[in-house]
Design a protein with these regions (language model features):
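Bacterial N-terminal signal peptides that target proteins for export
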Residues: 1-6
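All-alpha RGS (Regulator of G-protein Signaling) helical domain and cognate RGS-like helical scaffolds
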Residues: 20-213
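C-terminal motif of bacterial Sec signal peptides marking the signal peptidase cleavage site
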Residues: 14-17
Length: 213
């Protein structure tokens, strides 16, 4: 494996002056060539990519699958906007929508930066496609869309609790996969997903109990 090193920078003598010295340029990053090959000057982005830990198939599967998983949560919130007047649910839905959309953008960027396929947001909803853990089936989504008022509130909370539980299963599967989550970005992201989903499951479980009294 070729090493990436910083080339030494020779600086001219510095003379005292009333004028401030110009900003120093960062040292160029070079990659020594093999015998007979020339040395290459690398961009900062390429050098960082070469030093980045390897990406495993489990990493890619997790990010691709979680995009579809998050997209369904956004779809569920869209239904909530017109089917209930419960203010607490609307506030919950707003938080879920903002976080899920932001995380979808993050996952898409992660995949693009590593040259991986970025699936469409509803790739997991297609007929015959295998759903990620916790995702609602087409029949369950149709039942949720047809529900109103109190019935909708109950189905939304139970469905979203199930949905979040599936995300936890996906994180656990990732961490249990050999060679996975060595990339610092995906490790931090998956850890945040786990913490956030657990917190929201606890919140929604409390909301469901209050509405069943």
């Amino acid at each position: 494996m070729k090493r990436v090193v910083l080339a030494a920078v020779l600086t001219a003598p510095v003379f005292t002056s009333c004028r401030s010295a110009p900003p120093q340029q960062s040292a160029p990053i070079v990659q020594p060539g093999s015998p007979g090959e020339i040395t290459q000057v690398l961009t900062t982005e390429k050098a960082e990519a070469m030093q980045r830990p390897g990406v495993s198939p489990a990493d890619v599967k997790f990010m691709q699958g979680m995009i579809g998983h998050h997209s369904q949560a956004v779809d569920m919130v869209e239904l909530l906007k017109t089917r209930t007047a419960d203010r607490g649910l609307h506030q919950l839905g707003e938080r879920i929508e903002v976080s899920q959309r932001d995380e979808i953008k993050l996952m898409e960027a992660w995949l693009r930066d590593r040259g991986q396929e970025v699936p469409g947001p509803h790739a997991m909803h297609l007929q015959g496609a295998m759903l990620m853990p916790g995702m609602l089936s087409a029949e369950e989504m149709a039942q949720l869309a047809a529900a109103k008022a109190g019935e909708f509130d109950r189905l939304f909370l139970t469905g979203m609790i199930k949905h979040h539980g599936g995300a936890l299963s996906m994180v656990q599967e990732l961490f249990a996969s050999p060679g996975a989550a060595n990339d610092t970005d995906i490790y931090a992201f998956a850890s945040d997903v786990e913490a956030d989903q657990r917190m929201e499951i606890n919140r929604m479980s409390g909301m469901l109990k209050e509405r069943q009294k």
